[in-house]
């Protein structure tokens, strides 16, 4: 099974491709950080993130898209951008007929 892990963010969005090998062994295929310019309008930033995630899905063909859940922060603007980026990942996964799941940051750290 191949998983695209997404640590959503509007300024920096972490993407990783992980392959499940036999048993509980996994192989990190690639990791990348996609950045957008905070000077650009949010619609342009989301469109660029959409294009980037779409290209990663086309290139690596994951079975599952795992999105880290947005947790409550004090900065509402930051939470909104993170939630919007997560939504882009959800939509791209669904369009590619991938299983889309979400995990808390604690669950992600415990599994690595």
List where the protein language model places each region.
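Phosphate- and other anionic-substrate recognition elements at nucleic-acid/protein interfaces
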Residues: 1-112
């Amino acid at each position: 099974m191949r998983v695209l892990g997404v640590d959503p963010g509007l300024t920096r969005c972490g993407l990783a491709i992980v392959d499940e090998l036999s048993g509980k062994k996994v192989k990190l295929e690639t990791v990348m950080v996609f950045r957008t310019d905070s000077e650009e309008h949010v619609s342009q930033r989301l469109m660029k993130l959409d294009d980037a995630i779409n290209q990663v899905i086309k290139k690596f063909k994951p079975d599952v898209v795992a999105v880290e859940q947005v947790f409550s922060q004090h900065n509402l603007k930051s939470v909104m951008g993170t939630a919007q980026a997560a939504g882009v990942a959800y939509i791209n996964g669904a369009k590619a007929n991938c299983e889309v799941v979400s995990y808390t940051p604690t669950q992600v750290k415990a599994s690595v």
